[in-house]
Amino acid sequence: MNSIPVLTVKDVAMLDGVLGDFLKKAEADLTVVIDRGGNVISQFGDMSVMDITIFAALAAGSFAATRELARRIGEIEFNALYHQGNGSHMFMNSVDDDTIMITVFGPRTTVGLVRFYSAAAAQNVSNLLKTLQRGGHGLEFTAADISAAPIFADPAPTAAAVTPAK
């Protein structure tokens, strides 16, 4: 898994522009860009109806489970998933090897319209994230940076600190 790019306010504004344009064209309600681990990279739209963090984690799990189902029938993965509800629907598509775009929409649009515009939006998001990873602002955040280790623990004593002075 590639490193998660560190996003500045300007970077977020660029992502918001891509996602906002997509939502307008697709007439969808919400789009969220996540990594395959379920971490939110960017979001745009009406987020008042759900906890985005939990939503992202569950969507990543669903995408991972479907990836395994695809492998069981000889496919590498399914690059898109559609969940149809009575009033709300969800379309998930792969942005790249590390990223997923989730779109929530209602009855005022169709899955075909969402799917059509999501292809271009996913490509734009992928290109933008690749550019940000190359640029990096001199900062990097990798999956190894996420750990259960205590942040404020005293470091282990060094050999110099343990050896008595003569």
Placement of each model-derived feature along the sequence:
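Acidic, low-complexity cytosolic segments
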Residues: M1-L30, G37-K166
